[in-house]
């Protein structure tokens, strides 16, 4: 797990939330929330889903979606 996944996981744990809590509150499947925390991008059906879910999860956890999107794009862009 690198910076992005750790950021999500640490924010969730600091708030005392389980993945089940996050699933209920965001209506995002636990499978996708777990994939965000593990940075397992192949779980998502298309890149648009990973970006949208990343924004939603970041906002829910009180994180800066724009900053995390920049990290995501840097990690996933092709050389």
Language-model segment annotations:
Residues 1-79:
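Cytosolic/nucleoplasmic/matrix-facing N-terminal domains/tails
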